[in-house]
């Protein structure tokens, strides 16, 4: 649930824009679906949580790990690359988590997606649960690291928020469809 919901929340807008681009280029529904499915793996999300409570409730971490993590102010950084959700890093505090996410995204854009970046085919997204003020601040931090790249920001859906809790923030990139 988390993988498909979180990723689809973040990329929904771009997928619609890509489908419109393909439709306007004369592609039929089957062709549009095929292109969107092929390109969905050309994406990356990094997300950090405010609390470990919901990971504990969902059985993703033990109560003991949640208690220790809370006392130490640990903030996990999770990643979704293509179809897979994984732990990326454990950080002390949200500030460090944001730095780790931005550095990871920079690495993805400079290495994994370098050819798409050169061709102007990558776009950035920011997402959050609940705290719009913090999300706006994080969007500014993203813009400082990636000047000149449009960043679209949207809240994550309630179906995702109930699994990760209030105060989560994410940075993501995805490949835009380019019709030749």
Task: Place the predicted regions along the sequence by residue.
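Mixed-charge interfacial surface used for oligomerization/domain docking
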Residues: 9-180
């Amino acid at each position: 649930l988390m993988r498909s919901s979180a990723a689809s929340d973040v990329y929904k807008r771009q997928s619609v824009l890509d489908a419109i681009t393909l439709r306007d280029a004369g592609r039929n529904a089957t062709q549009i679906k095929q292109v969107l499915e092929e390109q969905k793996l050309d994406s990356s999300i990094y997300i950090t949580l405010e609390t470990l409570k919901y990971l504990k409730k969902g059985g993703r971490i033990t109560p003991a790990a949640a208690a220790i993590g809370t006392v130490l102010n640990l903030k996990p950084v999770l990643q979704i690359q293509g179809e897979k959700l994984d732990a990326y890093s454990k950080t002390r505090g949200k500030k460090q988590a944001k730095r780790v996410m931005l550095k990871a995204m920079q690495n993805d854009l400079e290495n994994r997606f370098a050819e798409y970046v050169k061709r102007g085919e990558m776009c950035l997204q920011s997402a959050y649960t609940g705290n719009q003020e913090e999300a706006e601040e994080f969007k500014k931090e993203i813009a400082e690291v990636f000047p000149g790249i449009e960043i679209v920001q949207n809240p994550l859906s309630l179906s995702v928020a109930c699994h990760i809790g209030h105060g989560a923030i994410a940075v993501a990139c995805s490949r835009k469809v380019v019709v030749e």
